[in-house]
Amino acid sequence: MKDILKLSIAEMHDKLKKREFSAVELTKLHIEAVDNEKLNAFVTKTPEIALSAAEKADHIFTHQQENLTPLTGIPVGIKDLFCTKNVRTTACSNILKNFIPQYDSTVTKLLLNNGAVMLGKLNMDEFAMGSSNSNSCFGNVKNPWIRADGAEVVPGGSSGGSSAAVAGFLCAGALGSDTGGSVRQPAAFCGIVGLKPTYGRCSRLGMIAFASSLDQAGVLTRTVEDSALMLQSICGYDTQDPTSVNINVPKFSESITHKIKGTRIGIPKEYELSEKHKEYAEISEMWSKGIQYLKDEGAEIIEISLPHTSYALPVYYIICSAEASSNLARYDGIRYGTRISSDDINEMYKLTRGYNFGTEVKRRILIGAYALSSGYYDAYYNKAQCIRRLVTNDFIESFKKIDYILTPTAPKEAFSINEQLDTLTMYLNDVFTVPASLAGLPAISVPIGLSKNNLPLSLQIIGNYYDEGGILNLASIIEKHTGRILK
């Protein structure tokens, strides 16, 4: 029965529909897996809620065979950044460690309304700030993959709990969030599929804010088709979110035709780093392999230039830190969250925030406050926004002559949990994912193979605005040639 855990969402749905097993049986198997997990992927478990949802799903399968939603009865995990009514939501920060929301985030509500079974809340870097899931108040998450030398490696971040849970067969799919690569990079490190839709495609209502102009909900699954099925369940216009876009939500799964003849694929020359950095040679070889797969299917390969790429990372860290310093100003222990009491209110603020925020969060608040301070606003934040526009314009100009862009997702494989990387090296994990985030473009990470250390490597496909269907179709070609690396 445990092989059931390794099925895709589409396969689970088909077998549930044929009544080869019940949603309750499927859910109980996942609950058992979650209870016995050694990855530290789940921070809050909701078995009673899951079984109740599974019973409802079984009733639907028994009495309604038509118009069944593809997520009915499917066990999923939700990143602990999304509010869940009456279920603890912490952003994996001590300052929110006992926060119980009174409402669901819009994407959570859509997911559950589509019949998904919530197994619990997933670990993450505190307030989504990190690339390794080592910045959580609940401790590190472990990647299910083990390096060839036996070393345990990180799952990536900030959606590390989501990627580890899906790759570790603890849930069939998971909600994540992506600010500068926080769905795509952990998906790459764990050998699964991670998709960030166009900014505004999914509502941000009830999603704890990190950087409001960049944050976007995303999905992590084991197959490209599953990403399509999950994505079409969480998209839609939300009148309560001013950044939500009122645009039709297609059935993304119908876009997967496996036909790309004549499709123009852009290869940005600025993303080729292996000539200067020999340690990136392995992903460069995999990139070439992916290019060949697409050529073999009839795609046209075109070299392009994205000249402002080198500015993307510093611009991103100025903007996201500035927005974080503003968003996190609300956490002071007055209305909710953990409070360190003092007779003096200013001292209480200082103690509460100083004790309950982690090191990385404090670092970004300080950087952001500096960038927004009087005398430096124009020199840093305003200039960063101007360069962001240039990065966006590079993409807009490129999409006049190409349809999609193919790049690596991350420069290297997952690194060891015990490896002490300096802050700059850690930030470089997002070098390939940040530009699409700055431009608000949809992007997907799909596995391309294994490194010499037996760890996953992945490629990223970037599409034009609202062309999630197109990037899913292109990713399905790479998936077809690569095969499923997750065993």
UniProtKB/Swiss-Prot annotation:
<dbReference type="InterPro" id="IPR004412">
    <property type="entry name" value="GatA"/>
</dbReference>
<dbReference type="GO" id="GO:0050567">
    <property type="term" value="F:glutaminyl-tRNA synthase (glutamine-hydrolyzing) activity"/>
</dbReference>
<dbReference type="GO" id="GO:0005524">
    <property type="term" value="F:ATP binding"/>
</dbReference>
<dbReference type="InterPro" id="IPR000120">
    <property type="entry name" value="Amidase"/>
</dbReference>
<feature type="active site" description="Charge relay system">
    <location>
        <position position="79"/>
    </location>
</feature>
<feature type="active site" description="Acyl-ester intermediate">
    <location>
        <position position="182"/>
    </location>
</feature>
<dbReference type="GO" id="GO:0006412">
    <property type="term" value="P:translation"/>
</dbReference>
<comment type="function">
    <text>Allows the formation of correctly charged Gln-tRNA(Gln) through the transamidation of misacylated Glu-tRNA(Gln) in organisms which lack glutaminyl-tRNA synthetase. The reaction takes place in the presence of glutamine and ATP through an activated gamma-phospho-Glu-tRNA(Gln).</text>
</comment>
<keyword id="KW-0648">Protein biosynthesis</keyword>
<dbReference type="GO" id="GO:0030956">
    <property type="term" value="C:glutamyl-tRNA(Gln) amidotransferase complex"/>
</dbReference>
<dbReference type="InterPro" id="IPR036928">
    <property type="entry name" value="AS_sf"/>
</dbReference>
<protein>
    <recommendedName>
        <fullName>Glutamyl-tRNA(Gln) amidotransferase subunit A</fullName>
        <ecNumber>6.3.5.7</ecNumber>
    </recommendedName>
</protein>
<comment type="subunit">
    <text>Heterotrimer of A, B and C subunits.</text>
</comment>
<comment type="similarity">
    <text>Belongs to the amidase family. GatA subfamily.</text>
</comment>
<keyword id="KW-0436">Ligase</keyword>
<feature type="active site" description="Charge relay system">
    <location>
        <position position="158"/>
    </location>
</feature>
<dbReference type="Pfam" id="PF01425">
    <property type="entry name" value="Amidase"/>
</dbReference>
<dbReference type="InterPro" id="IPR023631">
    <property type="entry name" value="Amidase_dom"/>
</dbReference>
<dbReference type="InterPro" id="IPR020556">
    <property type="entry name" value="Amidase_CS"/>
</dbReference>
<keyword id="KW-0547">Nucleotide-binding</keyword>
<keyword id="KW-0067">ATP-binding</keyword>
